[in-house]
Swiss-Prot record:
Keywords, in A-Z order: Coiled coil, Cytoplasm, RNA-mediated gene silencing
Protein name: Protein SUPPRESSOR OF GENE SILENCING 3 homolog
Organismal lineage: Eukaryota, Viridiplantae, Streptophyta, Embryophyta, Tracheophyta
Cited InterPro entries: SGS3, XS_domain, XS_domain_sf, Znf-XS_domain
Region (Disordered): 1-174
Intrachain disulfide bonds: none
Family label: Belongs to the SGS3 family.
Length: 609
């Protein structure tokens, strides 16, 4: 079989006759074949519809390849697979007990797969984990085989690497790199799959970069674990794995997809169907059946009237009613027409639901067990939302203007959109109402505050008026008192000035009298010398008197001038003190006004929302 080397075994279970050696089948180095045959032999199983259960089919105890008494031993330096691990074998101990003991595996070929397995007694595997017991240590048993396997694989692929991996991979075309014999079959499988199939999380893959080496038999569920393995492989054949990761990423990018991160495609849910819209009769109508009453003399059927029908369903706010008539009169079919709005449709739907809950809906009317008459002879009315077929049936015998006009409209457009708009408008209305209420509350608060402030201001103004009047009265009293004091002191000063003036008059009179006495003493009696001496004495007396008078007047003027200067100085000091008093009064009044200044009313620009 051409692909036996890839699947590491024959086509049937051990002991079935296909495995004559009684152990693992030794794989020889196959001759290079055309790419088409390699792709079919190696990757044909991956893209088959039954590829999902591949981990359990070839490798578990129930598949085509069973473990015998010999234990499958891994290489000592091999890391755990980064893809999805193979499921644990089921009923391993049962398979081992039913199998005949196998002989020792023969030595592998020089260029084949180096399986360093050793024979172990049957049943030595652990029933719980499938691990070899003591005496079959995979670390010690396969130490030599691992080294040989790695060396042989590296030697076997040396010609491939020298041709395709020694130079810069970016210098080669994408197609050339993809058609490498290691990857060609893998990418042929990818090309045969659709994008949806590529992204299936249950599809399993082998790593082509691990071909003919450790990890070649590992399965990876989905491309993401395979990509992670190729990007993080770090022990052997690193360059080959990085090349695979680069090619796979480029291939998926060219096909308009990408490796979905692990977990994104698992646990998918199926939601509602995409199309939720439907066509409805517009304006909304409810068909009411069994509205016929009786036949008249002309064998014509009579039925319910328009207003009578509306009155029967007055709780549902129908705007109009119409009845279907034919050659035989009333056909027993009537229609309640509702407003052309979302509210009208909701009313019609509410009436329809009422009929459904009462089990007098369309299904009951169309059934063979419908009840048209109730005990007592009353007719049972049936109703349901109108459809296009109902309207065509209603208009069957109507022509021209007598036909009931209607149109088929989108439910989402006429009902859902309007209901959403109504909801938004209602929310906006509630918002505006709340805003208006808050504004009114704020206005009332401002009005109350303004009233209180105005009242306080009025009271303050009245108090200020009273204070000003009292201040004026006090000022008048002070002026009167000051005027009285001024008159009093003026009188006192006059009393001082008057005696002084009298003294001055007496003084001048005394001087004049003495001068007159001196002049009268000048007589012609006596000798000339005596007269001359008397005249000189009189003249000296007069001159001394004149001199004394001049000195008196000078000193008097000096005293008056000094007195006037003192008065001016005193007045200046008085005015300065009066100015200081006025200044102190102004400062005290300013402080008093600041102390009793009313609070400033601050109105917010807008109420809080």
């Amino acid at each position: 079989m051409a692909s036996a080397g890839d699947r590491r075994g024959g086509g049937g279970p051990p002991g079935s006759g296909d495995d004559s050696g009684g152990g693992w089948e030794t794989v020889e180095k196959r001759v290079k074949k055309p790419a088409q045959q390699v792709g079919k032999g190696q990757w044909g199983q991956w893209n088959s519809p039954n590829a999902a259960p591949a981990p359990t089919a070839p490798w578990s105890g129930s598949g085509a390849f069973h473990h015998s008494g010999n234990t499958l031993v891994r290489h000592s330096d091999r890391r755990p697979a980064r893809g999805t691990p193979r499921p644990p074998p089921q009923n391993r101990s049962t398979g081992a007990e039913l199998q005949a003991p196998r002989g020792v595996v023969t030595a592998p070929l020089a260029n084949g797969w180096q399986w360093g397995a050793r024979s172990c007694p049957p049943g030595t595997e652990s029933k719980e984990g499938g691990l070899p017991l003591s005496g079959c240590d995979p670390e010690t048993d396969n130490a030599e085989g691992d080294d040989t396997s790695d060396d042989d694989n590296d030697d076997d692929m040396s010609d491939d690497l020298s041709d395709d991996y020694d130079s810069d991979a970016s210098e080669k075309s994408f197609e050339t790199r993809k058609n490498h014999k290691l990857f060609k079959g893998f990418f042929e499988v990818l090309d045969a799959l659709s994008v949806e199939q590529l992204n299936e999380p249950t599809r399993q893959w082998h790593c082509p970069a691990c071909k003919n080496g450790p990890g070649a038999i590992d399965w990876y569920k989905g491309l993401q674990p395979l990509m992670t393995h190729a990007k993080t492989k770090g022990s052997i054949k690193v360059k080959r794995h990085r090349e695979l990761a680069s090619l796979l990423e480029e291939e998926l990018s060219r096909r308009g997809t990408s490796v979905v991160p692990s977990g994104e495609q698992f646990r998918k849910w199926k939601g509602l169907r995409e199309g939720t819209d439907r066509e409805i009769v517009w304006p909304p109508m409810v068909v009411v059946m069994n509205t016929v009453l009786e036949q008249d003399e002309d064998d014509k059927w009579k039925g319910m009237g328009n207003q009578e029908l509306i009155d029967y369903f007055s709780e549902y706010a129908a705007s109009k009613a119409r009845h279907a008539y034919g050659p035989n009169g009333h056909r027993g079919m009537s229609v309640l027409i509702f407003d052309s709005s979302a509210v009208g449709y909701m009313e019609a739907e509410r009436l329809h639901d009422h009929f459904v809950r009462q089990r007098t809906d369309r299904n009951t009317w169309n059934s063979a067990h419908k009840v048209t008459f109730l005990p007592g002879g009353k007719r049972q009315l049936y109703g349901f939302l109108a459809t296009k077929d109902d309207m065509e049936t209603f208009n069957r015998h109507c022509h021209g203007k007598s036909r009931l006009k209607y149109e088929m409209r989108s439910y989402n457009e006429m009902v859902v959109t309007q209901m959403k708009q109504m909801s938004e408008d209602n929310q906006q209305l509630n918002y505006l109402k709340n805003k208006m209420v808050k504004k009114e509350q704020h206005s009332k608060l401002v009005e109350d505050t303004l009233s209180v402030v105005t009242q306080k201001l009025r009271e303050t103004m009245e108090e200020n008026t009273i204070v000003r009047n009292k201040a004026k009265e006090k000022h008048l009293e002070y002026e009167k008192e000051m005027k009285y004091q001024e008159e009093f002191f003026h009188d006192q000063i006059e009393k001082i000035h008057k005696p002084t003036e009298e003294k001055e008059i007496k003084f001048e009179k005394l001087l004049q009298e003495e001068r007159a006495k001196a002049r009268q003493s000048d007589v012609d009696s006596g000798s000339t010398e005596d007269r001359r001496q008397r005249k000189e004495k009189i003249q000296n007396f007069i001159d001394c008197q004149v001199k004394d008078v001049e000195e008196f007047e000078a000193e008097r003027d000096k005293l008056i001038k000094l007195h006037e200067e003192k008065k001016v100085k005193l007045k200046k000091e008085y005015l300065a003190k009066e100015f200081e008093l006025e200044k102190e009064l102004d400062t005290a009044l300013t402080a008093l006004m600041d102390k009793h200044k009313p609070d400033i009313f601050k109105s917010s620009t807008s109420p809080s929302t």
